[in-house]
A protein has these predicted regions:
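Short pre-active-site segment immediately N-terminal to the catalytic Zn-binding motif
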Residues: 107-125, 186-189
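Catalytic glutamate of the conserved HExxH
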Residues: 123-136, 200
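Post-HEXXH active-site segment of zinc metalloproteases
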Residues: 118-122, 134-173, 213-222
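Short alpha-helix boundary/capping elements
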Residues: 74-75, 133, 137, 206
Length: 257
């Protein structure tokens, strides 16, 4: 028997076989396994925050909330799951692992690597956002809004992927122009629009599930998108995918002292 299995780790495929899957009212399939430190009501409310039209596009996905999903270093044994947390195992884990389970795509999310409800929710909604873009693409009305913002050189972006692909799309590092207009890299533009949309979908869902300050999304690698530009994106996403019953979308601005 492999050392990883001997140390108490379990194959992800076994977790999937042995754990009963639940479905929220919006149609998302999910379950929890092991010592996740999650309250079931909080978990259910987070999963139920996914708007129904988005959830319908994720029919092949099942989300497994586990203490730790081990990183690629143990790939020879397949994806392994730790049913409990230890610092040593935590050092070998990753935020999530995608696992093919026959007709189902399993997403195993490491709850114990994500220090609080905000971090867990954002990891979940980022996964949902990417999966939705893969399944449904990007609405043209969103493309038009975001590209107009990029051409107008609004400050910042919503992720490093969006920031880097946007910079590559509009002239790259050379800033080359033809007839005074930037040369557009169409491949980078497509990547930018997809990243911006999946980010907006994730942040929108996060706002339905958790009250948070926009500054909490700040990263050192890129400047955050200007608040007004983000608000325009989120309002459009909310119009396309209204909140489920029992959830509310609201943007509140803090007054300057």
């Amino acid at each position: 028997m492999a050392e990883g299995v001997q140390s108490g780790l379990i194959q992800a495929t076994q977790v999937a076989r042995d754990t009963a899957v639940r479905q929220t009212a919006n149609g998302i399939n999910y379950t929890a396994f092991g010592e996740t430190n999650l309250d079931e009501k909080d978990l259910q409310r987070m999963v139920q925050a996914v708007p129904v039209p988005i959830a319908r596009a994720l029919g092949r996905k099942t989300y497994y909330f586990v203490p730790l999903a081990m990183s690629e270093g143990r790939v020879s044994e397949g994806t392994l799951i730790a049913p409990t947390y230890t610092p040593e195992l935590g050092d070998q884990a990753i935020c999530h692992r995608n696992v093919s389970l026959g007709a189902i795509d399993g997403v195993f999310i490491s709850t114990r690597l994500l220090g609080d409800r905000f971090a867990l929710a954002f990891e979940f909604f980022i996964n949902v956002g990417h999966a939705f873009v893969d399944a449904a693409g990007v609405p043209e009305i969103f493309n038009e809004l975001v590209w107009a913002q990029a051409v107008a050189d609004v400050r910042g972006e919503t992720s490093q992927d969006a920031w880097e692909s946007r910079n590559l799309a509009i002239g790259g590092d050379s800033g080359s122009k033809i007839d005074g207009k930037p040369v557009i890299d169409e491949k980078a533009k497509s990547s930018f629009l997809e990243s911006a949309f999946s980010d907006a979908v994730a942040i929108y869902q996060l706002s339905l599930s958790v009250d948070f300050d926009y500054s909490e999304l700040r990263e050192r690698e890129y400047p955050l998108l200007a608040p007004q530009a983000l608000a325009e994106r989120l309002r459009l996403v909310a119009k396309l995918f209204p909140p489920n019953p029992g959830y509310e979308f609201a943007i509140r601005y803090r007054r300057r002292a």
